[in-house]
Amino acid sequence: MLAPGMGEWVYKANLFLFGEFAYYYPFFLFILNYVYYKRNYKLANFTRRELFGIGFAFFSSLLLFAVFYPNSGYILELAYAIFSTILGHTGSGIFALLLLLFSLVLLFPKFAKEILKIELDFTYLLKVEQAFKSLLMRVFGGENEKEDVGKSEPIVPKLNILQDSIYGNLQINKKGETNNLEQIIKDSNINASKNSITTAKENFEKLKNQILDETIEIDKQSLKESRSFVHEHSQQVRNFAQKASKMSISLDEDFNFISEEEVDMIPERFLKPKKLEDIKQIDTNKNLDEPSYKRKNIEIPVSNQEVKPKIFTKELELRENLIKKEKLEQEYKAYQNEILENKVKQEIKKLEEYDAINSSDIIEGNKYSFNSPKTIKTETEESDKINENKNLDKADNIFEFAPIVEELNHPYIEPTPIKNINEIVIEEKNTLDFIQNTETKIDNEKTNDQEIKLQKAVLAKEIAINQALLREIEQGEIEKPKDFTLPPLDFLANPKEHKQEINESEIDKKIYNLLEKLRRFKIGGDVISTYVGPVVTTFEFRPSADVKVSRILNLQDDLTMALMAKSIRIQAPIPGKDVVGIEVPNDEIQTIYLREILQSEVFKNAKSPLTIALGKDIVGNAFVTDLKKLPHLLIAGTTGSGKSVGINSMLLSLLYRNSPKTLRLMMIDPKMLEFSIYNDIPHLLTPVITDPKKAVNALSNMVAEMERRYRLMADAKTKNIENYNEKMKELGGEKLPFIVVIIDELADLMMTAGKDVEFYIGRLAQMARASGIHLIVATQRPSVDVVTGLIKANLPSRISYKVGQKIDSKVILDAMGAESLLGRGDCLFTPPGTSSIVRLHAPFASEFEIEKIVDFLKDQQSVEYDESFLKDQQSVGVTTNESFDGEADELYEEAKRVILEDGKTSISYLQRRLKIGYNRSANIIEQLTQNGILSEPDAKGQREIL
């Protein structure tokens, strides 16, 4: 009881004395406490100038408050009464302002000199102070002590190089002071005793020691000469010297608005460079800081020794030995080939000489010609030169003619065109080379076949990872509707017959650039496989054992530049593998059509009526999923990322498999443009909802429908909607259709009615799976305030198209990567229950195709809306409340207490707090409104407490 009473008494006393000033002057004490801390909590460390400045500042502030609030506080009234009688109201204010300015000049003399151009001569102030003190001494008595002018402004000791000059100045001042003291002692102690003489000597010794301890201010020239060399060239040392001081010298250094000269608080022997190399390095650094036109040409020595890494020396030596061995093998093979070529040339020359000797004459046309061996040799040399310059196409045209070589035993033969034997020999050599080349080509084709088989095996393994997800989809034939015709595939456009040509040279170039860039960052490894898809090419890079995966992730921008790509995505590591996936966009991106997915065997063989087409994977195979297994889907993507195209493909894939009896759709489109094309199709449960208030009503009624279905399944003793429909088929009852709720823009709903929308989506996502109600929620802004923790926890399956920032990808996928997508339907899909991320490319369906399908469905059957989903439950509560005949609800008083205590007036909040139904909660809210406790709902549906 004492502490609160004491505090209240202090508060009242403070308010009585200072009035309005009592609310503000404690902040002045914070600054004073900081300055007191810097003075080591000793009042003796303050200069008289600072004490006078602090006192004048406090008094001038108090006087200003007295001028503005003359009737507030006893001290303020007293100060105002005194100064107003002397100076008047306006004069008191001007005097307070001038006194405040004077206090600032006293506290910050250097700042005032630089900024305000005000400089005070403190010697005059000291003379005024001395005159005032002597006046007081004469009036009240006491000794008139002479104060030393230099003592009022203590100066921090400075270490100087000019110690001799300082010592000389000290000796001069010491002699002057000692002479003055001796004269004072002689005048005052002529008739003193021996004791007084000894005391005077002690005082003399003390004063002499004090004079020796004092420093003398040096002029600016000596200060510049004495400045430390390291201080002059090192900003870090200057900062450290300023921060290392235990207490500052003046308030100008505490609040250092302008640059001041350094204070040498560290002995110079610790800062001075010890070696000549250090001084040269300082000169070099100073020279490099200068502009180019002032810079000197300093040669910086560069060590020629190679810096070898200390770690992995054995591995590096082994690698160097292997490289040397490989080079030696290549040189040995080249040497062997040269020996074989020389042997072949020698044999050919022997054959030519033998043929030249045996063939004495060679017929050209119808005439004889006798050629000597020398001429034959020259002709062979010329023919060799000619054939070397010929194109290699001659080898391909060898078999276009049949050269005839015969031994001539008679003088005449029919005129047949016979070529020179030398050319024939060369042609035989070319045929041998051609046969060898064909054999090597056949061997290369065999090896290429083996490589293709290996690549197909790797591709099959990659497909097997996606097939593991596709195998979870239930296989079988879907039951076709009897009284409804599903739309044919002819409404969808055929894909263009354009086979993707794999440019191996471009892929090899990208692999080389990738490995070269990684090698420059000292990351070893190799690309073990490459997959070419319709949109991206994936390189599987296996790093060395000593490489961290995080290092590769940090090089994403550098690899993007090296591969000359718009953006790349690095998956490190690929789940289930010891490799890193680097996905690079293709130069030509193929368009994926919806008809390709709907015609695929994966989509046709799926038994589930809620099979939706998601697109193609990175290899180019169709990828679908079952909405029942998801069971809800959260989609995010910026404008232009292909999000709306992907949602349209999902809707069309549902319409191609279901009649209105097996599937009903509820579309919520606050943007009013995306789903307007689907109006009046027979599958719609309500018209396309564009009003946020109607959307909240529809979601609340969907929760009521979920509860109704659970009651029906509980009565039928079934666990899910499939078993319930089978049982109703046997009993001849009414089946329950699947309901898919599609919300195109969640952010707009969260802005208008965030809490209610979050509550209803959370309830549907938690419980609606077994009742056959599924959600597809899309948003352009996947921030934390839109995709809240409740929504994110209950929507485990997510698709992210291209987003703007890494944090958005982290929110929607719990991983990075969506910011590096390409747009145009490029997306990442996280299946439920797995941590892997599948990259997909959404199919495209034009508006013309959608219009044809919608018109076909409208012609099949007219739409039947269920208007009960759009009714406002609050209006229902009003009608039921009017039927109460004035009787209040049993929980009326408790509800009134909850609303008044918590300050929340929503129906859903009261429903959760009292654990009652929605209708009863709405009735209680309406009763509170009629009784004047709550207001009518505003445009946002919120009520105020009256």
Swiss-Prot record:
It comes from the Bacteria. Keywords: ATP-binding, Cell cycle, Cell division, Cell inner membrane, Cell membrane, Chromosome partition, DNA-binding, Membrane, Nucleotide-binding, Transmembrane, Transmembrane helix. It is a multi-pass membrane protein. Residues 620-810 form the FtsK domain. ATP binds at residues 640-645. The chain crosses the membrane at residues 15-35, 50-70, 86-106. Residues 107-946 are cytoplasmic. Gene3D superfamilies: 3.30.980.40, P-loop containing nucleotide triphosphate hydrolases (3.40.50.300), Winged helix-like DNA-binding domain superfamily/Winged helix DNA-binding domain (1.10.10.10). It is found in: Cell inner membrane. One of its GO terms (molecular function) is ATP binding. Its main location: membrane. Pfam families: FtsK_alpha, FtsK_gamma, FtsK_SpoIIIE. InterPro entries: FtsK/SpoIIIE/SftA (IPR050206), FtsK_alpha (IPR041027), FtsK_dom (IPR002543), Ftsk_gamma (IPR018541), P-loop_NTPase (IPR027417), WH-like_DNA-bd_sf (IPR036388), WH_DNA-bd_sf (IPR036390). Consists of an N-terminal domain, which is sufficient for the localization to the septal ring and is required for cell division, followed by a linker domain, and a C-terminal domain, which forms the translocation motor involved in chromosome segregation. The C-terminal domain can be further subdivided into alpha, beta and gamma subdomains. The alpha and beta subdomains multimerise to produce a hexameric ring, contain the nucleotide binding motif and form the DNA pump. Belongs to the FtsK/SpoIIIE/SftA family. Homohexamer. Forms a ring that surrounds DNA. Essential cell division protein that coordinates cell division and chromosome segregation. The N-terminus is involved in assembly of the cell-division machinery. The C-terminus functions as a DNA motor that moves dsDNA in an ATP-dependent manner towards the dif recombination site, which is located within the replication terminus region. Translocation stops specifically at Xer-dif sites, where FtsK interacts with the Xer recombinase, allowing activation of chromosome unlinking by recombination. FtsK orienting polar sequences (KOPS) guide the direction of DNA translocation. This is DNA translocase FtsK.
